[in-house]
């Protein structure tokens, strides 16, 4: 399974008149039909040269990304996040599922679901590692609460065991 990266696409932080149509026009100018693909997406905020992910989602909706990302409860999440970070630029990254051949946008909701679910969970874990305040409430139980000595989670008090040190080195690049 293959995914491509598109963006970042800047959002109108005031959600002024016709902000949705302006956003979609920008997306479609970048890549025709991108707004109707099945994919994962990340809402992020940029301040200077630093960008942090704040919300990770996925869509396999028949209306594609366009029918999913700006549902009212998600816009409310974005507004809450932006209210706490008023000087940051809001953006969205898109990660559409691609076909294995010819690198076209995949329309296979059934066969793509597992890959999209996996990518969303992986992106949430990655986002959580750089921003513990992400707005996602699902799929964060294990990344927040599982500890594997030397590999995952906050170290308990005391020295790492030799096995923990070896495990830590094993997963470092």
State the predicted function of each range.
Residues 1-54, 60-173:
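Boundary/linker segments flanking structured domains
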